[in-house]
């Protein structure tokens, strides 16, 4: 964005009516920021705050052929190869943040006194928050580990990648939401990390592909298996 020295631009390098799949007509090209014709219009605020994201206009920009990344037509596949590992990384990062939110929530439940000096930990609502958050974190963690192991083994991880891409941000959102509720007004203040966590969890449901697209991919992969006369093996 605003701080970058160069951009990786994925653009169409073949006509749409040319033979072949549309995805095979995309190529990645390195464009230095100071190249003539590269115009940064503005920084784009995210969640009401300044960010490194920006709007860029490319006006008759020309770069040497050597700036092409990989072979012509391989840009889309290169991006997809990166996204798989990137989605696992984002899920792992989210689980770490969920863990931190959980620690802060339990700390508050154990120390906060309410009417008559009774601790929040004796309230069944709060006990439910702890149990639900534990299950959210543990299920997200195990799903992500399973997906990473499948990627490392060379098996097809696409359904699992889409599954964690959908599930983990939702679990993250639920855990942080409970932590905010336990902390009350302090939970939405800048003294605690929940506001940025909350925004991050919600953003992840859009970044690298929205929930709806990944749910469609999951369903199509499952249906394809059953149409072939097979069942889904949840053990692998």
Residue ranges: model-predicted function:
Residues 1-40:
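A short core secondary-structure module
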